Every structure is written in structure tokens, then in C-alpha cells.
Regions:
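Cytosolic, membrane-interface loops and tails of multi-pass inner-membrane proteins
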Residues: 1, 58-79, 175-201
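Multi-pass membrane catalytic core of lipid/isoprenoid biosynthesis enzymes
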Residues: 60, 68-109, 199-204
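Alpha-helical transmembrane segments of multipass membrane proteins
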Residues: 21-25, 93-98, 116-124, 144-149
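Small-residue-rich segments of transmembrane alpha-helices in multi-pass membrane proteins
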Residues: 18-21, 73, 135-151, 200-202
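Cytoplasmic-side transmembrane-helix entry/capping segments in multi-pass membrane proteins
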Residues: 111-114, 130-141
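Membrane-interface helix caps and helix-loop-helix hairpins in membrane proteins
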Residues: 100-106, 123-131, 148-154
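Membrane-embedded alpha-helical segments that form the functional core of polytopic membrane enzymes
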Residues: 18-22, 26-60, 68, 109-120, ...
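N-terminal, positively charged, Ser/Thr/Ala/Gly-biased leader segments
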Residues: 1-11, 15-22
Length: 204
């Protein structure tokens, strides 16, 4: 049970849900339906948990090379790859379907596009370019957009302003982690910014 809970990266998922709730609140302008909030948060939690779990599966070999992640359920051998893959797919499909049925199709589509861009674009790029951090900020900012569309079923200028703010907010967080664990990332072959700029003078 604890290992499966670890797979959804609860700390990251919690931040995703905060962003989703913020998007709902801002879109509702004081008239937020608690049921809409509940369905948006639950559906997003399932998609986010599925994304995190599938990321564990994809990066299981890299995680085994990093001290920070070597004790995760897959590299430590506590769970088998097939179990993790099945769990991740199940969460993702349930989340997408839940959002489509109980929220709206637009929010479901954004959620699934976020999952695909995170796993199929950002994740493999981490081994190829330090610009992966910039690319990863696009799906990273999507939860606030999903919260907005859950209420409005559309994304106007205000929604994109919120998206841009969350997009920009991620960089200090990303860069701080990349700097703190630069040796780990180098060992795993991930091309984070500190590998190109060991003195820490650059933000891009």
C-alpha cells in the first residue's frame, strides 16, 4: 500500500491539486460549486497520479543510479515493472474518463494531453538537453488551466494569464532542485542546467 502511494508522488500531486483548485476558484469569481471543485480535483488527482506512476516506470533505470531515488519502489525491487505499468495506465484512463463524464470533455482532453506531453516529450528530453526544464514547464502549468476549464468549459485570456504565471513560477523550483542534486543528475545522465553551467551563473 505505501509503495503504491509513493508511486503517485503525493507531494507533487498535492501541488497539482492546489493549482487546479486555484484555477476553479478564479474562474468561478465567487460562485464556485463545491461539486465542480470536487470532481475537478478528483479527476485531476487520478490523471496526475497516473502520470507520476508511469514516470516511475519509464525512469526506473535512471532512478536506480541516483541516491535520491534509488529506494523508490521499482529500483529497490519492491514492486515489479508490470505492476507499476498497469497501475499507471489504470489511474490515467480512470482520470480521463472521470473528467469527461463528471466535468467536461475539454478538461479531460487537456489532462490527457498534459500526461502525454510530460511522458513522451519532457521525460525523454531530460537525457538529451537542459532545455527539457523549459519544455516541462508547459505541462507543469496545465493544472491551473484544467481548473479554469472545469468551471467555464473554455479558456479565455484570464485563463492563459494564470497559466503563464504558473509557467514562470516553476523555474526557481526546477533550478533549485537541479542545483541541489546536480551530482545525482549527472550520474544518471540527465542534462540539467548545472551540467552546462557548473558555476550557477545562468537561468537558461
Amino acid at each position: 500500500g505505501a509503495d503504491y502511494f509513493c508511486l503517485i508522488k503525493p507531494e507533487v500531486t498535492f501541488l497539482v491539486l492546489i493549482a487546479t483548485g486555484l484555477g476553479c476558484y478564479m474562474a468561478a469569481q465567487g460562485a464556485l460549486s463545491l461539486w465542480t471543485l470536487f470532481h475537478a480535483v478528483l479527476g485531476t488527482a487520478l490523471v496526475a497520479g497516473g502520470t507520476a506512476t508511469l514516470n516511475h516506470y519509464i525512469e526506473r533505470d535512471l532512478d536506480g543510479r541516483m541516491r535520491r531515488t534509488a529506494q523508490r519502489p521499482l529500483p529497490s525491487g519492491r514492486l515489479k515493472p508490470r505492476e507499476v505499468l498497469n497501475f499507471g495506465i489504470t489511474l490515467s484512463v480512470l482520470g480521463g474518463a472521470y473528467l469527461a463524464v463528471f466535468v467536461n470533455l475539454l478538461t479531460s482532453v487537456i489532462g490527457l494531453l498534459t500526461l502525454l506531453s510530460y511522458l513522451l516529450v519532457y521525460t525523454p528530453l531530460k537525457r538529451k538537453t537542459s532545455w527539457a526544464t523549459f519544455i516541462g514547464a508547459f505541462p507543469g502549468a496545465a493544472p491551473v488551466l484544467m481548473g479554469w476549464t472545469a468551471v467555464r468549459n473554455s479558456a479565455g485570456l484570464e485563463a492563459w494569464v494564470l497559466y503563464a504565471l504558473l509557467f514562470a513560477w516553476q523555474f526557481p523550483h526546477f533550478l533549485a532542485i537541479a542545483w541541489m542534486y546536480k551530482e545525482d543528475y549527472a550520474r544518471a545522465g540527465m542534462l540539467m542546467l548545472p551540467q552546462r553551467d557548473p558555476e550557477g551563473n545562468r537561468a537558461f
